[in-house]
Amino acid sequence: NGGYLFLQKVYHELGLDKICKKIEKKHKNEYDLNEILSMLLYTRVLYPGSKRSSLEDAKRFIEQPKANIHQVYRALSLFAEEMDDIQAAVYKNSLKLGKRNASVIYYDCTNYYFESEEECGLRQYGHSKESRPNPIVQMGLFTDKDGIPLAFCINPGNKAETTTLKPLEDKLREKFGISKVVVCTDGGLASYENRLNDHVGERAFITVQSLKKIEKHLQEWALKTTGWKLVNFQGKNGPELSEIEYDLTQLDSQKYADALFCRERWIKTRLSKTGEELEQRLIVTFSFKYRDYLRHTREKQIARANEIIDKGAAGKLGKSQNDPKRFIKQESCTEDGELAGIKTFSLNQEMIEQEERFDGFYGICTDLEDNAAEIIKLNGGRWIIEDCFR
């Protein structure tokens, strides 16, 4: 197989062969790191599989590797030890091949499960993205604005995701030379500590904000039906907002099905632990299409919840956004208020109505003063990093 020859060109352009030689001089090992790394990368693209199977598959290449599996495993330990410097060197070498747009970077975390019940090293029990009862290892990833990976970190599966952002940002500044940057994250990584960290110097943040978690007076403002501006992503000078303000209740949802509306304001938040105050912009968007999507999804979940109640299989009630059991409530008393020996389950109409209030609405927080339409567009680019994980 000579397909790896096309990959070989990119491998050398990124200077990975020279990086390996530098590591060899430092550690004085007796095997060829360049051969092992190139073999692992080529087979990862051509024949994805385990390290052992990669070594076997590489025997199909015109240039076959001489390393054995024990040397491959020892090399992996060296690569792990030098990983920060390897990533920084690859980034700097990539700048010679083309422009890297690192003015806006996206960060997200995922985790990988192991078919084992024992915790060991990085493999720890934590919150699994797939809700599997297995130990997991966590991975954090930065991509640039174009979706090209910048840097990653590997952490134990029981580590809080919010604590992984700052250390990797520090590496970007110290080793990559990236300091003037806008960091985009989802709501799960948007702790106020992380926002404050990106609210200094030449750094800024854009993050998803759950409208269910903001103060009541801000919720009332966010869900008002009047004072909305239409977002135009195709403006003459880039994304822009309309001068006209709209009342959502007066609009034809079919005519404006693909439209996006926006409203914004500045808010102040004080951290209870330190007393520090953060001033940020709350940008709220509304979409009829998004509203209808949430309603349709909920209708199916309610139907599923009714089936569970009818079968008497409610069991432990759920809280997850995707769990239909969150719409089921449990009662252990009679209509007269007396304690009952038998538990009864029914639909939680109050929970359903509470969720319906937020249908179609979406929140973003930022400390940037740029056009709100531009902020919305930048935040929309977060799908790129999710694509990388797939």
Tell me the role of every PLM-derived stretch.
Residues 1-3, 13-390:
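Anion-binding and metal-coordination hotspots
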